[in-house]
Amino acid sequence: MTGGRIYTHSLEKLMPGFAEEAPLERKVTKERVALMTETGVVNIEYASGKPDDANSASYTILRSKFDKWFAEKCEEVGVMMVPGIRVDSLLMDGDKVVGIDAAGEEMYADVVILADGVNSLLAQSIGLKPELKPEQVAVGCKEVIQLGEDVINQRFGVENGEGVSMLVAGDPTVGNIGGGFLYTNKDSVSIGIVATCSDIGRVDVSIPDMLERFKNHPAIEPLIKGGVPLEYSAHLVPEGGFDMIPKLYADGVLVTGDAAAFVINLGYTVRGMDFAVESGKLAAETVIRAKAAEDFSAASLSYYQKLFENSFIYADMKQYRNFPKLLERHEIFNDVPEIADVLFDRLFRVDGTKPVSLPMFAIDEIAKRTSAKKLLDLVMVALDAL
């Protein structure tokens, strides 16, 4: 499962021109970030109008279509795909991983690459990563709603092939840490909620109910009205950032993608698939090198760590390593949307009453909701995150 957007630069380097044949939905041409209260929304939209090159484009996708195409491409170059098998445990020879056990069937390999998601029980079983903490992960809940291509074009103000990405903080999660998202596909939309596990139970609203709340918001309901639900899914998402990255290698094993916590959430964008593609490529390069030397020890596979530390994954995640601390602040999901709502309401309201000084009005509203010390602390955390 994915929210529905892939930044294509890493896949473009691996498969130049792939976008010409891959089952991509729409190219993202409009970025929307919104602060939402129960009845209002403050929305920022950006559309550059500049042509994207292949390395800077991003697209919405549906994994059911995209993964099938991608698997077929892998098979074309000799990969044997074995879907539908649950790996129960790793086969060990002392401290060395030598294969997998799948429902009693043993499969041996020189190297096992773990890509089993953020809750990688396999990586935990050999001590590469600790058990997850609730504040390190979020639950993503998504629905795909059929609308029709022309309806999407009209409602979102786009042409055929053009798409919208929308990320929302505030009311969708009832002030919990997390947010809502909406991506336009060719003839459907992907809409969902992400809520940090440590906040579940903080309010008496379940994750599915949060999604319904989001869908019924006055700013969202007109966009999806009359749609037909096609699918429903849920997924655990890493939220801990750079400091959550585990040890990435051991004798006979490497860790990639979500299992390695290779995801960053910046509020205005969420990235994971481009990291997953790149980490898979780096793992493959490491195995090829190890095979040439017939050395699959931890010392040999540590080359993966070196490649990782010289990659854009490492650079991006290190740059924003303090962002999770900012997104742990409930003020962002409670006070900030409420303050933005009342400020913009005051800014645009014309009712014949005595005008007010907007700066003083803003100070007043902020003072009602938080102390100067807490506000200053939030500003300092934000500066540190950036």
Residues of each region from the PLM?
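Predominantly flavin-linked oxidoreductase catalytic cores and closely associated redox partners
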Residues: 64, 68-69, 73-223
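Short coil/turn segments at secondary-structure boundaries
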Residues: 20-24, 155-157, 225-227, 317-324
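Helix-loop-beta segment of a Rossmann-like dinucleotide-binding subdomain
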Residues: 42-65, 194-197
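C-terminal auxiliary extensions adjacent to catalytic cores
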Residues: 327-386
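Active-site-proximal substrate-binding core of FAD-dependent oxidoreductases
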Residues: 282-334
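FAD/FMN-dependent oxidoreductases across multiple families
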Residues: 170-177, 186, 199-279, 295-306, ...
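N-terminal FAD cofactor-binding segment of flavoenzymes
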Residues: 1-40, 311, 315, 319
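Gly/Ser/Thr-rich active-site loops/lids in small-molecule metabolic enzymes
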Residues: 134, 138, 272-285
